[in-house]
Amino acid sequence: MSDVTLLRIGIAIVGILFVAAVFFFSTPKTSAHRVRTKKEEPPRERREPMLSTEVDNSPHQSVDEVPASVPQQQVNPEATKPGEIELGKRPTNHFDKIILLFVAAKAEHTLRGEDIVVAAEKTGMIFGYMNVFHRLVEGYPERGPIFSMASILKPGSFDMANIREMQIPAISFFLTLPAPMTALDAWEKMLPTVQRMAELLDGVVLDESRNALGRQRIAHIRDELRAYDRQQQVPPLIKNSRW
């Protein structure tokens, strides 16, 4: 073996040892630096799920941050302001149960105010009480809404004067029981409306837990409402007697 070959082998071995030494001594320092960097970062504030109407007004707010509840003012007829439209107002502030659905924008998108208004009109909803949309009993508007639709951003209303600038992550549909018809009939009117709104707005339908609304959940809701309707049927106090 020539001297040149031995020299090349020696240089290669020294090079390998040098690279290994650099890697060995630099890796712990880098890790320590990363640990210190993480410690120096202030802890992020953890946002707990909200159960109130205090929702951020940011148009890009994620639907995951939306509270699974309905603003109290929307089920309380005593909250009417002077001069406010009362079409869609409930005749009483009593309610037993609320069925809630969402239509949410797809990822990286929002729902535009103008599009919401057009879609609501196409699905037979009327703008009214509390400045939100309602589905009313045809020919009997005084009976109150079958269900209503609101913005998920507080206070839940639609500002028609600035509707062109409105962009929100989702809208909510709520069926307040007792309704002006049986609970199951009200649901059968609400569900296709919500699905059609999602189609018109290119959105997705979510349940009250903000999960995709599937057939199994729909079946469970129907069962719940059938049970509710049975509970509302009061048996006669006195049986008809035979003479």
UniProtKB/Swiss-Prot annotation:
InterPro entries: Cell_div_ZipA (IPR011919), ZipA_FtsZ-bd_C (IPR007449), ZipA_FtsZ-bd_C_sf (IPR036765). Keywords: Cell cycle, Cell division, Cell inner membrane, Cell membrane, Membrane, Transmembrane, Transmembrane helix. Its main location: membrane. Residues 26-243 are cytoplasmic. Residues 38-49 have a biased composition (Basic and acidic residues). GO terms for biological process: division septum assembly; FtsZ-dependent cytokinesis. The chain crosses the membrane at residues 5-25. Residues 1-4 are periplasmic. It is found in: Cell inner membrane. Belongs to the ZipA family. Essential cell division protein that stabilizes the FtsZ protofilaments by cross-linking them and that serves as a cytoplasmic membrane anchor for the Z ring. Also required for the recruitment to the septal ring of downstream cell division proteins. This is Cell division protein ZipA. It comes from Xylella fastidiosa (strain Temecula1 / ATCC 700964).
